[in-house]
Amino acid sequence: MKLLNKIKNENAIEFQILIEKSEWEKKHKESFEKIAKKTASKLKIPGFRPGKVPVEEAKKHVNEIEVFETTTNDLIPQVLTFLEQDESFINDDSETVDTPSVDILDFKDGELSLKVVYDLYPVATIESYNDLILTPIVNEAFEHEVNAEIEHALNSKSQRRVKDDNEFIEKGDEVRFDFKGMIDSVPFEGGSAKDHLLTIGSNQFIPGFEDQMIGLKKDERKNINVKFPDDYHATDLAGKAAVFEVFIKEITNVKPQELNDEFAKSFNLPNVNTVQELKDYIHNQIVLAKQEKNSERAWLEIAQQLLAKAKITPIPQSLIDREVSTLRQQVLSQLSQYKIELKQYLEFSKKSEAQFQEDLIRQAKETITLALLVDDIAETQNIVVSDEEVKERVAEMAKLYQGEEQAVIEQLSKNPDAVKEFLLHKKVVNYLIDLNKNNQPKNTTLSSK
């Protein structure tokens, strides 16, 4: 076996290999014998029982094209081993894409010439990334947000009892009812609803509405007379008198949960034993949620600017095809969760299969480019992920699957590179956000949403 030539460009490395006559003949003989035995087991010839045809007889019926193809395919692993042990391959530090393609160049005088092509990973570069414009964001939890979560938690643990038909509405009750609003006997837009839920005393409705519901019983009807406030947000209703026909369907007595340390302990949260510790925990969770949401939003802004500034060498088709396949599978998986077929999705989106494929190709190229840029920035800025960080992340993810923690840990531990890639991406995004946090677009105000 000989290396005849090596041709390298920015997209690929091509190696031309010669399999000499002695090697070819040896492997050809092995292939011929193997195929002859297989042929003998299937061949039907008058005078011989099925499967009992002698191998020597079967050799007369062997398909030579099949032998040639089998010989070539059986030699390929040896060719790759030979090539990857050759100095011209070992000393080349180019990053190649997975398995190479192998094609026949020539077969002459009992010698086979093969072309082995390794696609090269593209190289993405960017001149600068400290001038990215980001919408300003404040990752802060406000008191009213914490109180709203506390109120929601209190309501979730309140004692509830559906009242009997002869019991009437009291302040604090939750009422399910239908209503129809009219002004001058004419219904107005947005003034009607069925099975609406209202806690009496919450002041969700206009002044006087809830007070007039007190004392009603299930299945009762009543006309409630109110006046929209002069400063009502819907200017066409502001200051006008209205009548609401209400029909009571269900009354639920709600015994509020008291906000105390026992309530705080009932959630079994780590290091939460008092009301203040519960509020601190909720505060931190709100901050973390905002950080995650704002990080995702910032990455969308960053990604578009990186793509606009980046330069990249041609992306091998094999890499694009693989990423397209992954993206397509992700779409199909998401659609299956909602029991939607791809054909239906394309109809909803008003896209053809060809347009859908074009979108996937564009997304694939962008995904590959961004991944290369993230890796390049990480290397340049010495951003790394330790094995300990991977273990911590695996443990965090396992906690989301109560009762299956160990199985999740074992599964994720089999592919630590995927976890490491996720964490590296997150670190690079946080680095870019911090680097560009003062680069704000003109005429913007801080937002905490």
Curated annotation (Swiss-Prot):
Query: Reaction(s) catalyzed by this protein?
Result: [protein]-peptidylproline (omega=180) = [protein]-peptidylproline (omega=0)
The entry's keywords: Cell cycle, Cell division, Chaperone, Cytoplasm, Isomerase, Rotamase
Name the GO cellular-component terms.
cytoplasm
Could you tell me where this protein is found in the cell? Cytoplasm
Domain named PPIase FKBP-type: residues: 172-257
A GO term (biological process) for this protein?
Answer: protein transport
Keyword Membrane carried by entry: no
Does the record carry Chaperone as a key word? yes
Give its E.C. classification number.
5.2.1.8
What's an example of a GO molecular-function annotation for this chain?
protein folding chaperone
Q: Matching InterPro entries, A to Z? A: PPIase_dom_sf, PPIase_FKBP_dom, Trig_fac, Trigger_fac_C, Trigger_fac_C_sf, Trigger_fac_ribosome-bd_bac, Trigger_fac_ribosome-bd_sf, Trigger_fact/SurA_dom_sf
Give a short account of what the protein does. Involved in protein export. Acts as a chaperone by maintaining the newly synthesized protein in an open conformation. Functions as a peptidyl-prolyl cis-trans isomerase.
HAMAP family to which the protein is assigned, alphabetical: Trigger_factor_Tig (MF_00303)
Which family does the record assign? Belongs to the FKBP-type PPIase family. Tig subfamily.
> Domain comment?
Consists of 3 domains; the N-terminus binds the ribosome, the middle domain has PPIase activity, while the C-terminus has intrinsic chaperone activity on its own.
The protein depicted here goes by the name Trigger factor
